[in-house]
Amino acid sequence: MKGVVMFPDKVLRKKIEPVKKIDKKTLREIEELKIILQESENGAGLAAPQIGVNKSFFGIKEKGGVRMLINPKLIAVYGEKVYPKMVDNEGKESDFLEGCLSFPDLFGTVKRYLKIEAEWEEVKNGKLESRNKTMMGFEAILWQHEYDHLLGILFVDHIKEDGGKLYLWKGEEKKKISIDEVLKKEK
């Protein structure tokens, strides 16, 4: 079984191919991604390029398992991109820090739409069936993050473009680091 591909592996920037038919190989790749995501402690989503597969699908953890989204498309966005916030149990607000399994211990502030509409396909009885949904909050943020992977866009690209903050977070220690230091590893 494959593992999660780490930055700066070039497969993370590759243009993916749509899934045209559900054959044994594709079903095996989908199942493999699903297992890797289920077994990951910190992952909320995982895209095919992150396991070295050049196909258009990703998985999102939900209550009761992993939903696999095939050939996803972003249909509409609502409002403006913003830096999402979190509120803890005491009502204290802080920046929502986005992470990625391909960037262990790195987290950053990423501008995202808080409401989106999307469509995709799911495998049912060996065939692809269409789905669509309007999503808000964390679900919308997660969907955009995984969808970006299919376009070769990484969360650090948004941080660089929008001037967000990037942190190295190991255990209890969190320190701000330079986005340029991370991106220069790609060269």
Residue ranges and their predicted role:
Residues 1-187:
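Positively charged
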